[in-house]
Amino acid sequence: MAAGQDRAMPHPVLIIAHRGASGERPEHTMLSYQRAIDQGADYIEPDLVPTKDGVLVARHENNIADTTDVATHPEFAARKATKTIDGETMTGWFTEDFTLAELKTLRAKERLPQLRPGNAAFDGQADIPTFDEIIALAKRASAANGRMIGIYPETKHPSYFASIGLPTDARLVAALKAAGWDRADAPVFIQSFEVDNLKRLKAMTSVRLIQLMAATGAPADHAASSYAAMATPAGLRAVAAYAYGIGPDKAMILPAIPGAKPTALIADAHAAGLKVHPWTFRAENIFLSPDYRVPGTPATHGRIEDEIRAFIGYGVDGFFTDYPYKGASARASALAAAAERGKD
């Protein structure tokens, strides 16, 4: 097997379902993950945060004010708090202040109802899933569909959670080991915007690691001066010492200005031996690169498939999308076109 080849997956470009099929169902719910699997996703992505009793659950943030009905539960009114996490002060209800049993009494809701009103029709239909439940879903679906469906967990705010006595790295590794997924060829990637926890994880597991990068700012653990510095050829060589690939904001590859040309990031990452999985491809105008927007409102769906095809043409190895079926369609047409060109 060639170095770096993904034995578990049949395609050269991976479709990573961002929080599940979050363009069509409330994010980080079994509804969303199942929808993504049905639409052809290769991987489903749970962002992981801990409960008070140390159970890993899937929420984009530990503040669950916008993604659950917690505000309607009078028994939890006193849990409302203001906290500073990674330099950002926020008010709401936080997973680390609830036991798993308490969280399971809540119901998920759509985070962006103004942009995705159709998703709000599913409010109240799903609870907060645990990481173990998501692993079990991926295994059941793999057996039922006759194809491997992987998981792509993100460790959220690892330094913050360690600082309050709820470190997540060992819990994540233990769950993967229990699932039999502790090999470099397991259908798993672990991702983080921080650096030091990925370095720790490298010593704890053989699972492939992905260094996430934002278009601005720096890792919250202050392990690097900026994401921009990490994205230079020298920075990428340093990342390659502990990571299998990078997950950059797609604006780091195609700047978010009309008429932009792609940067050298993909070529530089590949030269360092890193795979490239950019985020996040969403259909709504507000999220698309400027050249792929269409007339209408911020919620109007633009030319997402054209955008994905362009990035596949640039050489990405996978991509995160809220709309896996559109990603699957774009990938199929891009690969068919490439195969046709190869006949010439």
Predicted features along the sequence, with ranges:
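Phosphate-group recognition and catalysis centered on beta-loop-alpha active-site segments
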Residues: 1-344
